[in-house]
Amino acid sequence: MAFVGAPFCIWLGSTSVSQVIQTTKWIIPTLQTIHILAIAALFSSAILFDLRLWGVVERDLPLKDIARRFFPVIWFALPVLLISGAFLIVGEPKRALLNTTFYLKMALLACAILVTLGLQWSLSAAPDFWDRDRRRKNAGLFAATVSIMAWSGVLIAGRWIAYTD
């Protein structure tokens, strides 16, 4: 079940930008490399922040310091991912836009971004937000778990796009 129909994909695939992407041998592998490097930077930063929230790594550092270290990487890598992903879609519109797994990836991406924004916002409002009481600590553990699951789901769904319809 795709939200975008084949006629749109045919039109998009026939645009001059799509034609250049499709016919220049090095563009798609370069875009894929950029996309993979950006997701590696974003994913590792998000996971390390989440693991700190769990208390698994860097327990001796305040959470605000961990956030200061990793959130800039996340917010730098995200637009790189979105731009490289958009060009990959333009280059191969049917591969993504007619694939249900692509829409699963987009839903997981939206969830992951919202959770990450919520985690960052809570710390900017109060640096000790997740450490104030047991209820907040449990909520932080839950948010970190959702974050890890959502970002992992983005990775997995992104990889599966090549192998599903």
Tell where the protein language model's regions lie, with residue ranges:
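Polytopic transmembrane helical bundles with strong interfacial aromatic enrichment
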Residues: 1-165
